[in-house]
């Protein structure tokens, strides 16, 4: 399997001379974390929501050019799946542009696309605890949504577990939840303001979870069947960590020893 078999085609993009506010609107509307940036029709890099979220709407003359991450890797459609998967899981942007021989954008490859080839990558049968992240950014149901949204952007997270005082997981709130319900513009609201909203109003409950000693294949099946990207990990009914699609790909045998070169 090659990149051309699984990549997303006709991707959204922005030009280096377009305004940052326009790029941000596209990312909010489609719940994207990043967008390819073009210069004279060729890929110049990536712009991320994390980089531009704090550009105020009053600064309408700020262009994309000043925020381009030009050092991001690119792929071509003929690159094999193992190498492509390795590159995607080791990039901070989460999505990698796919270009033709003239450096023109022909697609995007994301972690979700990589999952289409998961059987070919030979996922190991190991406990979730071996690949989960143990230090988890969490929120509580009474937390102000503006602060939670800001944390998601700052740490580059697609969702946070919602826990009670006993560290029991009672729900999940995702960037998609925030965007779909129209709260993606509140990052500058005051927690004490009249328009403040709490997590409990939009969180999904009960949360989908896995146990620390479950096989990582159980988590992979959940991601595939439920189309979600992060799952809290429990040990003795308490939050012990979190596992995401990137962790799943890192646990594939085929990637062991693969390099980006």
Predicted segments, located by residue:
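Short, surface-exposed recognition loops or helix-turn segments adjacent to catalytic cores
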Residues: 100, 131-132, 140-142, 164-165
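Transmembrane alpha-helical segments that form core, pore/gating elements
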Residues: 141, 146-147, 156-164
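A glycine-centered beta-loop-beta connector
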Residues: 27, 35-48, 88, 96-112, ...
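Hydrophobic, helix-prone linear segments
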Residues: 1-47, 79-82
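Tandem CBS (Bateman) regulatory domains
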Residues: 1-10, 48-74, 81, 85-89, ...
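Asp-centered catalytic/switch region of ABC-type ATPase nucleotide-binding domains
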Residues: 228
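Acidic/glycine-rich phosphate/pyrophosphate-binding loops and surrounding catalytic core
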Residues: 93
């Amino acid at each position: 399997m090659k990149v051309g078999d699984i990549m997303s085609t006709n991707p959204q993009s922005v030009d280096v001379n377009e305004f940052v506010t326009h790029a941000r609107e596209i990312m909010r509307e489609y719940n994207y974390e990043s967008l390819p940036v073009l210069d004279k029709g060729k890929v110049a890099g990536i712009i991320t929501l994390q980089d531009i979220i704090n550009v105020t709407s009053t600064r309408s003359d700020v262009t994309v050019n000043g925020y381009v991450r030009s050092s991001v890797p690119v792929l071509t459609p003929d690159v094999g799946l193992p190498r492509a998967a390795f590159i995607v899981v080791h990039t901070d942007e989460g999505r990698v542009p796919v270009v033709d021989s003239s450096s023109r954008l022909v697609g995007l490859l994301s972690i979700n696309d990589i999952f289409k080839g998961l059987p070919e990558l030979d996922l190991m049968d190991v406990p979730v605890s071996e690949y989960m992240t143990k230090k988890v950014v969490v929120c509580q149901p009474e937390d102000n949504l503006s602060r939670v949204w800001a944390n998601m952007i700052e740490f580059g997270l697609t969702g946070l577990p919602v826990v009670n005082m006993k560290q029991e997981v009672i729900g999940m709130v995702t960037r998609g939840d925030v965007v779909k319900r129209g709260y993606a513009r509140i990052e500058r609201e005051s927690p004490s303001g009249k328009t403040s909203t709490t997590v409990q109003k939009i969180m999904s409950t009960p949360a989908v979870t896995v146990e620390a000693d479950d096989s990582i294949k159980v988590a992979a099946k959940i991601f595939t069947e439920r189309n979600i990207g992060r799952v809290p990990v429990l040990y003795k009914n308490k939050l012990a960590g979190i596992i995401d699609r990137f962790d799943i790909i890192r646990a594939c045998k085929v990637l062991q020893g693969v390099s980006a070169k």
